[in-house]
Design a protein with these regions (language model features):
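The serine-hydrolase catalytic nucleophile loop
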Residues: 79-91, 308
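Alpha/beta-hydrolase
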Residues: 202-285, 292
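Conserved alpha/beta-hydrolase "acid-adjacent" motif
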Residues: 303-309
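A catalytic-pocket lid/entrance helix-loop region that shapes and gates access to the active site
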Residues: 167-215
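Conserved alpha/beta-hydrolase
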Residues: 94-113
Length: 315
């Protein structure tokens, strides 16, 4: 594996990690829409709007205690699985330190509700849309650069942005960073086999055998194959380690009026079909050098996207 090289100047950006950890926070801050009562001397940012990206209106939510704060663009994963309600629910403290920007990418969330059949929806269009959004944010808040965070498949978009447009960003942070889906798949499958053998789970072992053989009963499509494995990862606690947090995540997805009746899997399946399952074959291991500071945050109990794959990429 080639070594990913980092420009580690401006190490003050390490402070960003203290904020970014809040993105995966484990407790609700109990503030309406993630905001405390603000001082009259500040000009807070609390905007929910549609921005034209790639020729189509897409939903963007910007929240911060002051327009003077640094801007952080959060790229959700899936593709087709928005994080806006989760960011509202878990991340009140972050909006005191930064202007947190949540974008529902084309084909999901409020963007999907506004336009359920976007003309452009591909890995390339997502990167292009994110680049356009970056330019919009820089102009809107008069910033030379912004901070960039990519989560799960959003980390694929993030790495490509950081590689192609380093002058736009202070720092890139990959949360559950995707490097090679096939390598992550192999590590995840090996973990599942060990778990199933330890528990003498004959049913799980049989399902794993069918998945490996790409049997049509579980792998009619590449998405079906992924979901068949995901069910087992979920069963053994390899997605959300703490069951109490799983309940909080479910609560976040249903408590806000604008997402209360949102069909998460309808949009996810739509996006997967439109993108021909490309998310499940992604490999960006050829990105071996970035010109900005980069940080990877991985969960030691994450066996959907095992952190060891990203760790190996930089060692």
């Amino acid at each position: 594996m080639k070594q990913l090289k980092y420009n580690i100047e401006n190490m003050k950006h390490l402070l960003l990690l203290l904020s970014v950890v809040l993105l995966m926070g484990c407790q609700n801050q109990n503030r309406k829409d993630g905001q405390e009562k603000l001082s009259e001397s500040t000009k807070p940012v609390q905007e929910k709007t549609f921005v034209e990206l790639g020729g189509e209106k897409q939903y963007v939510e910007m929240t911060g205690a002051s327009e003077d704060l640094p801007v952080m663009l959060f790229l959700h994963g899936g593709p087709g699985w928005p994080q806006t309600p989760h960011l509202r629910y878990f991340n009140a403290d972050l909006t005191k330190q930064m202007i947190l920007v949540s974008w529902d990418q084309a084909g999901c969330g409020q963007s999907y509700k506004h336009n359920p059949n976007p003309e452009n929806l591909s890995p390339e269009s997502l990167v292009n849309d994110a680049h356009e959004l970056t330019q919009y944010l820089k102009k809107r808040f008069n910033k030379e650069k912004i901070f960039l965070v990519g989560f799960s498949y959003g980390s694929v978009i993030g790495m490509k942005l950081a590689e192609q447009y380093p002058d736009d960003y202070h720092t890139y942070v990959g949360v559950s960073q995707v490097i090679s889906v096939s390598e992550s798949w192999d590590v995840s499958m090996q973990w599942l086999k060990e778990k199933a053998q330890q528990k003498n789970d004959a049913t799980a072992l049989m399902q794993l055998d069918l998945i490996e053989k790409k049997d049509s009963t579980v792998c009619a499509t590449i998405l079906d194959c992924f979901m068949s494995k995901y069910e087992l990862v979920l069963k053994y606690g390899g997605t959300v380690y703490d069951t109490a947090i799983a309940k909080e995540i479910e609560k976040a997805e249903t408590m806000y009026e604008d997402y209360k009746n949102y069909d998460w899997f309808e949009a996810f399946n739509y996006t997967s079909a439109r993108m021909d399952g490309v998310a499940f074959t992604t490999d960006i291991s050829d990105i071996t050098e970035l010109k900005i500071p980069v940080y990877f945050l991985g969960g030691r109990h994450d066996w959907n996207l095992p952190s060891v794959v990203a760790e190996n990429h930089i060692n």
